[in-house]
């Protein structure tokens, strides 16, 4: 039996010229498929058409036929489809609803009225498969990104699906977490069908059977793994399978920011380090929970109320650590991971323009150039954009202010290689100072002038070339 059969699928979004157009697609039971393509190419739309989110949850115009294990998706409910097909999303926090790991694992199975004894048996079995047996009694909010993804994956597997759909499962987790989740998926290959949408092509190539590449809503390649050398991925705006020789010289700019930062919660020290930022791009890498985001918030002056800052922050020799947040914001711009919290306007152009208008730095030409450079639809609602597009809106809104020091927390999350390159080129062209927190070794290798690694709350300088060794 085929896991998936698609015939004449057309998906049209209201108020958008974008569409998905798949004439025919079959996936055999037991196959593992990689779906690749630039942001906006139709990957998520295709996955949502398979798991029933389209047409049952997202309002679109659609036609054609989608069957999973012989069941017509349009004529079934999402709950019926979920018994056969489990879905793992980019952001694990969006799929976690319970306080303890064991409660989270049991949650879906309980909703299916599975007997308690059977649920406990499945929890024991699945927790070993995904490597979370030691986490069963841990609070979910204390987990790392990789641990959260494995917990969500475990909660899906407990419901015994016949297939998995994974929408960029490694995009929001660190390098350690990425290795953990990919190792788990590799072990599941022989047990079920899988469709994986992923930008990190070289990381999943070794265990997929086929590669399907989308462009502008259409399938342009459907090849077996053995024929992967026939495709120039970078020419398609996708990650290359191997990094090319470094194209640009690393710069050694003047010192702009000098800081001594100590952050505590009253019981333990979270960050205790010194850092010097020179003009140009400095990258900050490190495992989830090492203190990277806390350091950025300390520099920006927006630590949570339960955390205490000690130290000094000097920009161009002037102490700013005592300045109120609004004054410090005229010197340092901060991009959080939770970018939805930044949005207040109804259109992309209004959102990009707003911070510049508040600071009386508005320039129509600058706004138009940013919208063009970052390929942003100026009249769209920013809340309805993809994860990658939302980040480009938020970054553009900061760049429009003319601030000279930028703290960017995970700006490449959810972005394809084309847009990550565009971001890197844009940052390099600006006469400013950037500290970029990222789990993206390719971006660091190509665009960072300096690299720091956060280890247990301390910043350690490392070589950009070291970042790419295990890529």
UniProtKB/Swiss-Prot annotation:
Record key words, sorted: ATP-binding, Cell membrane, Membrane, Nucleotide-binding, Repeat, Translocase, Transport
Residues the record lists as binding ATP 1: 37-44
GO molecular function, one term: ATP hydrolysis activity
Domain ABC transporter span(s) in chain numbering: 4-241, 255-470
Role according to the record: Probably part of an ABC transporter complex. Responsible for energy coupling to the transport system.
EC nos: 7.-.-.-
Protein localization: Cell membrane
InterPro entries in the record: AAA+_ATPase (IPR003593), ABC_transporter-like_ATP-bd (IPR003439), ABC_transporter-like_CS (IPR017871), ABC_transpr_CbiO/EcfA_su (IPR015856), ECF_ABC_transporter_ATP-bd (IPR050095), P-loop_NTPase (IPR027417)
Residues that, per the record, bind ATP 2: 286-293
Family: Belongs to the ABC transporter superfamily.
Lineage summary: Archaea, Thermoproteota, Thermoprotei, Sulfolobales, Sulfolobaceae
Enzyme category, top tier: translocase
First and last residue of the signal peptide: none
Membrane topology: Peripheral membrane protein
Protein name listed in UniProt: Putative ABC transporter ATP-binding protein STK_11360
A GO cellular component annotation in the UniProt record: ATP-binding cassette (ABC) transporter complex
């Amino acid at each position: 039996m085929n896991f998936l059969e698609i015939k004449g699928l057309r998906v049209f979004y209201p108020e958008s010229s974008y569409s998905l157009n798949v004439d025919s697609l079959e996936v055999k039971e037991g196959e593992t498929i990689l779906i690749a393509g630039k942001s906006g190419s139709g990957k998520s739309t295709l996955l949502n058409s398979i798991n029933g989110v389209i047409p049952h949850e997202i309002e679109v115009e659609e036609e054609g036929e989608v069957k999973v294990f012989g069941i017509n998706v349009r004529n079934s409910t999402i709950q019926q489809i979920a018994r056969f097909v489990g879905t793992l999303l980019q952001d694990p926090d969006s799929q976690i609803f319970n306080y303890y790991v064991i409660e989270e694992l049991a949650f879906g199975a309980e909703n299916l009225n599975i007997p308690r004894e059977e649920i406990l048996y499945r929890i024991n079995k699945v927790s070993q498969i995904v490597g979370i047996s030691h986490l069963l009694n841990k609070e979910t909010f204390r987990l790392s990104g990789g641990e959260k993804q494995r917990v969500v994956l475990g909660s899906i597997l407990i419901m015994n699906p016949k297939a998995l759909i994974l929408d960029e499962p490694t995009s929001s987790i660190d390098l350690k977490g990425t290795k953990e989740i990919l190792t788990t998926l590799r072990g599941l290959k022989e047990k079920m069908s899988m469709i994986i949408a992923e930008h990190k092509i070289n990381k999943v190539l070794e265990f997929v059977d086929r590669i399907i590449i989308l462009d502008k809503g259409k399938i342009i390649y459907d090849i077996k793994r053995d024929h992967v050398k026939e495709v120039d991925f970078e020419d398609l705006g996708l990650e290359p399978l191997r990094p090319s020789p470094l194209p640009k010289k690393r710069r050694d700019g003047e010192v702009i920011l000098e800081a001594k930062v100590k952050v505590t919660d009253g019981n333990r020290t979270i960050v205790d380090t010194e850092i010097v930022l020179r003009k140009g791009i400095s990258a900050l890498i490190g495992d989830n929970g090492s203190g990277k985001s806390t350091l950025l918030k300390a520099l920006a002056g927006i630590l949570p109320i339960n955390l205490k800052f000690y130290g000094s922050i000097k920009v161009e020799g002037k102490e700013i650590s005592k300045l109120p947040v609004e004054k410090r914001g005229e010197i340092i711009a901060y991009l959080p991971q939770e970018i939805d919290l930044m949005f207040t306007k109804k259109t992309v152009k209004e959102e990009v323009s707003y911070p510049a208008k508040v600071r009386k730095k508005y320039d129509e030409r600058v706004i138009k150039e940013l919208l063009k450079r970052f390929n942003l639809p100026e009249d769209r609602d920013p809340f309805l954009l993809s994860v990658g597009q939302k980040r480009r809106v938020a970054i553009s809104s900061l760049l429009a202010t003319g601030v000279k020091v930028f703290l960017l927390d995970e700006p490449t999350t959810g972005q394809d290689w084309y847009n990550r390159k565009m971001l890197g080129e844009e940052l390099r062209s600006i006469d400013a100072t950037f500290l970029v927190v990222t789990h993206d070794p390719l971006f660091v290798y190509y665009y960072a002038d300096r690299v720091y690694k956060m280890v247990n709350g301390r910043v350690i300088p490392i070589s950009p070339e070291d970042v790419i060794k295990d890529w």
